[in-house]
Every structure is written in structure tokens, then in C-alpha cells.
């Protein structure tokens, strides 16, 4: 796990104090109290664990507040489908929700849009040429939907791939921001997503400080986008450190 027993669960909130430029939007801009009591620029604690599924090549469990997901990775293995020879491997991603994950989403069915977005987020970071003619399957399951589900899934999937020994250019982290009125709220929960005017999700390789994907919905001003990007970059850097600590602790435990 990323946190030792008895220790406080780490958070990846972006650093606001000490920045050269103050945030454009402040908590006082809107008479809004976050359901879980956090500040607008405060992320939920991130609990991470690898090796959650013993039968998988690699796996990870992530718990960000009430959002709980588990990701299993199988492979590289020979594809069951006949495929033309390729110098690079093949990546399959599947996202599903348990029946009890959410009153509205918990249908136990696959979510094709999330599966596609997870695939896009991961394919750019995996060294596909290291497993030609074979397939890596990523199965992501949302145990409990508590908000920012996709960003948690992407970060957890990256951790599971690392646990499986899949070669990557870097870990990949994902962070979401909701725009409600004039205020930006990082790592939104379900209630906040339900009344947001716009959503923003960024995936990046934290060690390289390189953005790999942006997903923006709703109406955003240029200052809004710039502020959201900085918040996500700061949070991604901290989340990357938490993920690397989790992998180090897992490796140390395996050596004992």
C-alpha cells in the first residue's frame, strides 16, 4: 500500500501556497460547500495497493474517497483471435461497473466510452514494440462510483501495468476538475459532477511533466483552462510520487 499502517493516507492536492501566481478562482467566489468538506483545490486521500488479484499478471486497487476501483492485467499472451503479423503488441481495455457501484450506473455492463478513453490514455505510454504478436488485456472494474471515476481508473490501470512488468515510458496519472459557476473544484465527487458547468480531465506522464491527453466538456474560458491545467499538473506530480512509493513498497515486501 502507499500508506503504512497507522499513517495518514496521502493526498495529492496541488500546492497553492508559494506559487508565483495566485489561483484565479478562490473558495470565496461561490457560496458552495463541498459535500466532503474539502477545499476547492484539495484532493481526496489516495489509497493504493498492488497485487490485489493473485491470478492476474499484475493488478492494483485504488480508493479515492468513495471511489473504489480494481484493475487486472493479463499478458502479454498470444492472441486468441487470428491477427495479421505486427511488430507491435495489441492492447485491449474493458471497463465495467458492479451492480452495486451506483444507483444509476450499476448495471454490471461494459461502458464502451470509458473503455475507449482508457485505451487512448494507456496506448501512448506503453512500449507496444516490446511484446510483438501478443496481447495485453486490461480489465477495470468500478466497485463503488464516488466521482472522478475515469481519472481514478486510468491511474489505477497504470499502476497495474507496472505491477505486471509491462514496459512503459512512464507511469500515467489522471486528474479531473469541475467548473461550477466561477469556481474550479479538483477531484470532484458525484454530487459535484452532477451540477458542473464544465468538466476537465488531464492525463500526463508525471516524471516527464508531459501532458498526454485532455478531455474538456462544457464552456470554458481561457483563464479557466489555464488554471485547471496548472492544478492538474501539480496534482499529477504528487500523485505520481504516491504511485511510485506504492511500487517501491510492493517490491520491498516481495524481497522480504
Curated annotation (Swiss-Prot):
Gene3D superfamilies (alphabetical): GHMP Kinase, N-terminal domain (3.30.230.70)
Annotated knockout phenotype: Extremely slow growth, especially during the early stage of development.
Keyword presence, Repressor: no
Keyword Transferase listed: no
Subcellular location: Cytoplasm; Nucleus
Entry-linked PANTHER family: EXOSOME COMPLEX COMPONENT (PTHR11953), EXOSOME COMPLEX COMPONENT MTR3 (PTHR11953:SF2)
Function description: Non-catalytic component of the RNA exosome complex which has 3'->5' exoribonuclease activity and participates in a multitude of cellular RNA processing, maturation and degradation events. In vitro, is a processive phosphorolytic exonuclease and requires a single-stranded poly(A) tail on the substrate RNA for its activity. Plays an important role in seed germination and early seedling growth by mediating specific cytoplasmic mRNA decay of transcripts coding for the abscisic acid (ABA) biosynthetic enzymes NCED5 and NCED6, and the ABA signaling transcription factors ABI3 and ABI4.
Quaternary assembly: Probable component of the RNA exosome complex.
Protein name: Exosome complex component RRP41-like
Native source organism of the sequence: Arabidopsis thaliana (Mouse-ear cress)
Lineage of producing organism: Eukaryota, Viridiplantae, Streptophyta, Embryophyta, Tracheophyta
Gene behind this protein: RRP41L
Amino acid at each position: 500500500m502507499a500508506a503504512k499502517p497507522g499513517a495518514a493516507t496521502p493526498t495529492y492536492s496541488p500546492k497553492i501556497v508559494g506559487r508565483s501566481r495566485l489561483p484565479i478562482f478562490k473558495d470565496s467566489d461561490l457560496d458552495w460547500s463541498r459535500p466532503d468538506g474539502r477545499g476547492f483545490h484539495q484532493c481526496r486521500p489516495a489509497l493504493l495497493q498492488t497485487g490485489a488479484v493473485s491470478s492476474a499478471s499484475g493488478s492494483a486497487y485504488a480508493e479515492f474517497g468513495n471511489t473504489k476501483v480494481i484493475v487486472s492485467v493479463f499478458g502479454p499472451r498470444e492472441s486468441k483471435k487470428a491477427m495479421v503479423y505486427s511488430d507491435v503488441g495489441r492492447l485491449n481495455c474493458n471497463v465495467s461497473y458492479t451492480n452495486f457501484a451506483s444507483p444509476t450506473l450499476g448495471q454490471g455492463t461494459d461502458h464502451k466510452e470509458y473503455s475507449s478513453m482508457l485505451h487512448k490514455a494507456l496506448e501512448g505510454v506503453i512500449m507496444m514494440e516490446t511484446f510483438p504478436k501478443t496481447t495485453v488485456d486490461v480489465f477495470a472494474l468500478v466497485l463503488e462510483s464516488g466521482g472522478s471515476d475515469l481519472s481514478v481508473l486510468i491511474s489505477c490501470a497504470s499502476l497495474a501495468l507496472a505491477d505486471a512488468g509491462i514496459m512503459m515510458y512512464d507511469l500515467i496519472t489522471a486528474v479531473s476538475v469541475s467548473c461550477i459557476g466561477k469556481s474550479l473544484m479538483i477531484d470532484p465527487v458525484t454530487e459535484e459532477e452532477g451540477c458542473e458547468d464544465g468538466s476537465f480531465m488531464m492525463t500526463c506522464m508525471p516524471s516527464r511533466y508531459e501532458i498526454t491527453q485532455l478531455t474538456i466538456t462544457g464552456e470554458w474560458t481561457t483563464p479557466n483552462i489555464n488554471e485547471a491545467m496548472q492544478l492538474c499538473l501539480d496534482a499529477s506530480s504528487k500523485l505520481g510520487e504516491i504511485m511510485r512509493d506504492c511500487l517501491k513498497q510492493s517490491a520491498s515486501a516481495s524481497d522480504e
